[in-house]
């Protein structure tokens, strides 16, 4: 199903009825409203003006449209900030942020939590039983603009309480953090400050705990809203719209309190921000990289325990990236179908009409500011017509699992040990290699069951807890670990037994030394799979195992024990392609090296082929396949769907 984000408060009431009618005629089913409307709902403290929202919801309902109602806590009004100036967050440099943008609040602020509780309760009491309201979105894009981590006095106080609950005694904290180093011992929890503005780098254990705390504070704030909505809006779904390439917040943890996950898909903006080779960035500037949206669909399907929406789908040029090209004609349709192929229940476009004013006036919508339909509108309407003729089959478990860990991203942010080391970069390298082989992927958190997966890839998991080790031991397929896995304890120390720590229960090896290398400094590793030039990261390993790949000095780059493999270097795309293809074949899968720009995704017995390239390509469909959309020759920026026997 399809939807759209709509802001009735931005437009004269005389337009609302016509807008709703055109939404229905375009084949849209859901409309998100209200997530930035607090100042219009409550223009002065205690003076509520519900009338305009009542009328807007009634207008949408009259056309049979279902509403996703956003709680308005992402934008506290000016009067609230003036009354409680302490709700404003403090940045890493110790500066109090100001009113005038959005997300201008601290998650730890008692005053703001109380105000949020009040407005969400009023909203839920008024609309929780309304038939037109299908569900709620909590807040909007938690953490956007660098707002997960605040450094205000309230956060410092809350952090001390969090530490006391975690460690119990200050002696335990000192031991866990290794505060004997640099004379950093603490006598009590009130001496512990937030880890910023230090002369040299702060203690990494301290910093990691602060990142954990900050993520927990967001979850607590979200749970406060969820509990209110559950009480006053029984039977209505609750979701939140997460962001792309964002790791400050543990979405797996927060989503435990939601019915499903949502995310905001902007393929062109993300591609422009990605550290891709220049030629690749130019090639996909108007289409988005072929794996950027797909990765997040698979991630948030995992976050949502099998269920997700795209709450905001890019319909045209955006306004927030360094460069904001217009999508190639056909791409809005392709992105929409791709989301559906990966299991999205709803794809909702942002926004119905481009705003002619304020910060996002250069962000395209389905309509231009003069209300004329724009390119994205016609493509969305085409998808709606195509969807009406098809009944999508359910999504099955993929044959490949990729283990993704937000805590791993924090570990490497705290201590990258190399300027180019990027957790997301490594994750994307593995994911893209799998996709280039035509393989479907489930993205799962550490500790999730790996039963039923023919192949599991763990690009890097520095902290291996007991539940994760148990899942690896019980995995039914091949498991590939990437560099730095098992390299830290839960308290951010090197394991006594050396890395890969607990994974030594699976692989008899020890990492005794590591190095990070500047770009261009490469070493050749070779073995039965071929010769590969590797750089950026290398580990020296002691092991009775004979390496599958070895460097010229005899050091190993890849080791195997039974169905477990350990990669002791940053892999090149060439190495990953050969290695993963071989492992997939061994696991009984059928990898296929796809043409550049072509990607596949299966949904039940249906196979989707998406062509991100400027030239037509042949879909790897068997002879006599029944095509539901398109044909065996997939045109530029087009797709095809066929049914497997």
Swiss-Prot record:
- E.C. numbers: 3.2.1.23
EC top class, as a word: hydrolase
The membrane-spanning stretches of this chain are none
Source domain of life is Bacteria
Q: Which residues form a coiled coil?
A: none
Which catalytic residues are annotated? Answer: 141 (proton donor), 312 (nucleophile)
Q: Which CDD domains has this protein been placed in?
A: A4_beta-galactosidase_middle_domain (cd03143)
GO:BP terms for this protein? galactose metabolic process
Is Zinc one of the keywords UniProt gives this record? yes
List keywords of the entry alphabetically: Glycosidase, Hydrolase, Metal-binding, Zinc
- What GO molecular function terms would the record report? beta-galactosidase activity; metal ion binding
UniProt catalytic activity: Hydrolysis of terminal non-reducing beta-D-galactose residues in beta-D-galactosides
What positions does the entry give for substrate binding?
102, 140, 320, 360-363
Q: Which family does it belong to?
A: Belongs to the glycosyl hydrolase 42 family.
The protein's name: Beta-galactosidase BgaA
Protein species of origin? Thermus sp
